[in-house]
Amino acid sequence: MDDELRERVRRAAERAALFNALKHGSDAQVGAIMGPMMGEHPDFRAHGDEIPGVIAPVIEDVNGMSDDEQRARLAELAPEDVEELDSEDEGDDHALPALPNAEAYDEVRMRCAPNPNGPWHVGHARMPSVIGTYKQRYDGSFVVRFDDTDPETKRPDLDAYDQILEDLSYLGFEADEVLTASDRVETYYEHARRLIGMGGAYTCSCPGAEFSDLKNSGEACPHRDKDPETVADEFEAMVDGEYNSGEMVLRVKTDITHKNPALRDWVAFRMVDTPHPRDAASGYRCWPMLDFQSGVDDHRTGVTHIIRGIDLQDSAKRQRFLYEYFGWEYPEVVHWGHVQLDAYDVAMSTSTIKERIAAGELEGWDDPRAPTMQSIRRRGIRGAAVVDAMVELGTSSSDVELAMSAVYANNRDLVDDTAPRQFLVRDGFEARGEGPEESHEAVEVPVDDGPDEATPQVHPEHPDRGDREIPVGERVLVEATDLPAAGDRVWLKGYGPVRYDGERFAFLDADIDIVREEGVDVVQWVPAEHNVDVRLRTMDGDVTGYAEPGFADRDADEIVQFVRVGFARVDAHRDGGASVAYFTHP
């Protein structure tokens, strides 16, 4: 990052921190401003790993100001931001906008309706993050409904049902009610029969292309005026599985001349020859389309507010015809834009990830390169860090991009205080796929005249947690890039300053002022004779190296910080093999 860009980052951070602090009446946090700042300045994203360190002092300065000082400074930088603050309702400190007409309902009831055709990718976390936050805000209810009524095109994955609920729990939410649409097929049949009795639906055997031509020209197909008795008989034949796939559908009778062809006599039920993978639903061949199934379920389960993609606006319009037939009141709807994700080379698509796994290009859903919930969990990213970043995106109808650096900043705030420090000396890199090459090499150097043991702190901010005891021995390992020129000094962290003569380190003394006053580099190291082989799995490849001996005592799932490398989750210690850790973030 050059000086000009650094100054732009500082100025943008100052403005964002001032606005955030004044809006919420509390100290600004790095994680809270990273997402919006990255969204407003896309050119910052390439430097996402550096930005937290650049903006942290700026935010600290802002937090040290009084409210009046913050307001005056923001007026200098961005008077329009002050106007926006003045126009907002006093005391409204929510990241999300108020739900429409929430006060008109006894209880706000929202649903997350995943298709269980595979485990969740990171983008799937947006819906439960926002709905869960609204539930807390309005003391409402959170319904999870598995929309699994397409056994062919988006075939359900039997493992995904439980995996999705586990991901929901990881994010910090529990559903008040869990429903599975394929358990409710008889309910959809009942409503179809009612609709047929009203004259609101008809069976149609037109080939798809033929009906499409008629629909686009605003002409009714010859089946539209069938009497309800014939329609009822043919629908029962559909239910009994007497038609093959594509031979018969049930259509909702709307307006065949509607200005939007997508709303003209849409399909409510179709025949599917492929059995459902769930035993309880495997006998059905007549399946509702999502707009019919979802519309019925939203009413039957008392949903008051729906959040769905901007591309699904026609779904609401189609369902309103259904609601008018039944005399139901349609829920409030918020349409939002799509969310994109930076930092990954793999597309955020369930089908694409499945294909990459099947082809052997990914090792599984928890591969560090996969943009999936299982992957970020295994890396040690807390669910709350994801939720906060998703909520900060809001519910705008515009497409948004989630900067993973914002998730990392949130997570750093959550884990930094508790993560014990450890030394890791890297000594190799195994690239996976087309990831960038890295070069790491450990160098063994004899040490003369120093203490037998080093005692670095467990955590530099918490001296009360004690020290780590690391036996030094006769030789240490350092990374080749940290080796100084002959005659120069370095500070072996937790041990002391040494001078390198081109072959050996000679211990000098333990005066920390050498580092503070003379700019001596501080480097991590491990004893050459007493260390732990480590394989650190990253998004780009596997880093091999050596950790200090105490790493062997760290529990699986514990988050540590490898000094000058980054945070990592301890995955497993293996007898006779390397311990495995997953790189979390810098």
From Swiss-Prot:
Enzyme class: ligase
CDD domains attached to this UniProt entry: GluRS_non_core
UniProt-listed InterPro entries: Gln/Glu-tRNA_Ligase, Glu-tRNA-synth_arc/euk, Glu/Gln-tRNA-synth, Glu/Gln-tRNA-synth_Ib_cat-dom, Glu/Gln-tRNA-synth_Ib_codon-bd, Rbsml_bL25/Gln-tRNA_synth_N, Ribosomal_bL25/Gln-tRNA_synth, Rossmann-like_a/b/a_fold
Coiled-coil portions: none
Keyword ATP-binding: yes
Gene3D superfamilies, per the entry: 2.40.240.100, HUPs (3.40.50.620), Ribosomal Protein L25, Chain P (2.40.240.10)
Chain location of the short sequence motif 'HIGH' region per the record: 114-124
GO biological process: amide biosynthetic process; glutamyl-tRNA aminoacylation
Chief localisation class: cytoplasm
GO molecular function ontology, one term from the record: glutamate-tRNA ligase activity
Bias-annotated ranges (Basic and acidic residues): 431-443, 459-468
Catalytic activity field: tRNA(Glu) + L-glutamate + ATP = L-glutamyl-tRNA(Glu) + AMP + diphosphate
Family in the record: Belongs to the class-I aminoacyl-tRNA synthetase family. Glutamate--tRNA ligase type 2 subfamily.
Biological role stated in the UniProt entry: Catalyzes the attachment of glutamate to tRNA(Glu) in a two-step reaction: glutamate is first activated by ATP to form Glu-AMP and then transferred to the acceptor end of tRNA(Glu).
Full protein name: Glutamate--tRNA ligase
Source organism of the structure: Halobacterium salinarum (strain ATCC 29341 / DSM 671 / R1)
Lineage, highest ranks first: Archaea, Methanobacteriati, Methanobacteriota, Stenosarchaea group, Halobacteria
